[in-house]
Structures are given as structure tokens and as C-alpha cells.
Amino acid sequence: MWVWLHIDQFFCTCKGRLIMPVWLDAVPKKAAKVPRPDTLRWLLFLVFIILSGIALTLWGWTAERTGFVFWFTALGLPFCSWGLIFGLRRFAYKAEQVGAQSRNVERALLIEGEIQRGQRCAWILISSVQHITGNKTGVLIKAVENSSPATQVSAPRGCVSAVRYAALNAFQTDLDSEIISITSTLVAQVQKITELLPKDIPCCLMLDCDDDIRSRVEEHFRNELLAKTGRLFRLLAGKGLAAFDAWLDQHWEQPGILVAVTFSLPAQPDEGDADAITLLILSNRKAVAWPDTVCLHRPEKGQEAGLEKTLNRALLWAATDSVALKAGWHTGPAIASGSGWNMACENNGVVFSLSKDNRSIDPALGYAGRAAPWLAIILASAACNDNGPQVIAAQPSSNEEDVWVTVITKEEVRKESSGNV
């Protein structure tokens, strides 16, 4: 069991980088207290050994039954044998005791290190959203608060019949031109940020979009980035919050940024869905040029039925008490149809109103699919500036049960981080 500790440390470290996700549940349980040898049993065993020694000596002794040799054989030899066995057992007990204590110390250090790694976070330098309701977070938040539905009957590019959803209509009529236009707009925002950053800072790109437009979006976006910023952005293999989670581990050793871009433009949307395009630029160090940025903490993945533990773990990563949370934001059909999220909030002791401050963005803005977590994060980050820590629960895909929970706070510096961007 304890070999796991060393295997984990061996495989998790690659050129100084931790490459495995934080998973506290994989840490072995605390070693049980080693039971002390039962004194009464050993005394009874001593009596048995001595009686057996006397009986065997009397039965097999043919010489005169007197003298030192006789009595040592009858009494001393059994007693010495018992003492040797008891000494070995006592030594084994002490060895087990020391081993258990050392394993528990090692386990505690591992947990402490994993928690410290889990509490890595990123600062949101800038965010942007394209939605039919509007492009400003204030407008979107007001729409969510007023529950003003943005859905309307539209004809998606991949459907014969019309569907009631929150569509970006321009993308349905002239998709290629709109992709070029919005890409230029987003890259221009990235350029404004990179101009204020050191030239040698590592830059990563998380680009998530629908499969039918992926090749066009990736090629054009990467070319635009290189042409306008003059920087080489490393495209991450992962998508969504899973990519952000991995980025915190794989690119933590030195200051860097992550450009997270999501195009959610489904060709065949369901009723109540939404088109949305989001952009966030995240830094794994506090940025001097942006002193008032909020902090996105490591997300935790779970399922709707087990969100109590997921929320508890997300609070641990944020090093935040549940009573400090001021509001909640959630999106996704599994969360909307179930009671797991409300129960998780109650059981973790949140104090904000679950009817007023626990906001679902889907009734007003529609369900944005792969962009839904980032849309909720953008709204929560804007609210955090004015209202304090926010918690987000988001389901990235209606076809999967995974739900991500994360916390946004105003954070100055983390223990593991060093230096600024």
C-alpha cells in the first residue's frame, strides 16, 4: 500500500514538474495503531513452555535427576527459549510501531504537499464574451437577475427546422466571415495584454470549439496570434476546465499566461441552448500591471449526486470557508433538474440565500455547452469585485454527468508562487 507514496512521487515528477492531477482520495488511509502483545497470553505461554519442558525432561532423562544440568534442562532451557521468542516478538512490535509512525508522517507530508499543490490558482487578467444578450458583463448579470430569456426561434446551420435558442444569428448566415471577424477582435484583446508582459514569458492557448469548425478556428486563431503578438503560443491538448487544471500543474514552475478561448456554436442545438464565445487570459502569478484582478482557484470535478464532497474540495483548494461565500452561479441541465447543488451548499454551511443569491444563468442566457463554465466564471468574476468570493458549478456537456466546481476570490499571493508577471 505504501509503495504508492513513492510511485506517486516518481511518476508525478518530470523535470521538476508535477504532471498528475491532485487526487487526495488516492492517498492511502492512515496506518492503524499496531496492537501491543498481550501480556497475559505470553505469561500463559510461559507456563505452557515450562510445563512442557519439565514433562519432556522427566520423560526422556535417563541419568540421575539432580544437579545443574538436569534443572537447567528442565526449567532454564524452556524459560530461555520463551525469552528468545518473546524478545523477537517485542522487536517486531517495535519495528511495526516505528514503521506505522513513519508512514503516517510521510502520509501527512504528502497530504500537505498535495493540498498546497491543489491550492494553486490563476489571476484573471481580462475576460470577454460574445452573446446575443450583450457583450458586457454588467448587461449579462442584469439579465440573469431579471430572468429575461434571450431565446428566440432561429434556424441553425445544421438543422432543417427552426429551434428556440439564444443564437448568434450572424454565425448562421456567414460563418467563415464571422469567425475571421471575431478572431481578429479576440486576438486584438490578447495583443493588448501581451504588450505589457515580458517577451520571454511562456504563453499557452486552450482553444475549444465545435468539431465541425475546429480546423478553421484553430488555424486562423493561431496564425492571427503569431502575426499580431509575435509570440508562439503552445496549444494545450486538453479542453475546458480540465485543461486549466492540468496547466496549473504542468506550467507552474515559471510565470506564464493561459489564453482560454471557447467557441460554442452548435450546428444542431437543443431547445434552450445558447451560442457563446468566451475569452479569458489567466496568469499563474500576480500581475503588477493588473493589481485588482480576481483569482480563479483550481476546479474540482464531480457529479451531481456527489456535489457535497466536490464543493468541500473546491473550498479546500481556495483556502476559503463556506461562510465567506457571497453568491453562487450554476449552469447545466443536470444541476437544474437535480437537488444536489442546493444540498451541497446547505451541507457545507454556506450562508448566502439559496433562493436569491444562488443564480442559474441558463433561464436567461440559455445553456452554452462547452462555453457555459467560462461564461459563469466571467459573470462570477465581475460580481466578485463588488460582492466578495463567489462559487461556480458548471456542467460543460449535457451528454456527460461531469460537473466542475470552482471558487473565485480576491487573492494577493499563494505560498507556492514566487515573483510576479
Located regions from the model:
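Conserved "HGTGT" condensation-loop signature of ketosynthase/thiolase-family condensing enzymes
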Residues: 2-252, 269, 278-421
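A short, hydrophobic beta-strand-centered structural micro-motif
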Residues: 254-262
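Aromatic/basic-lined ligand-recognition segments
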Residues: 272
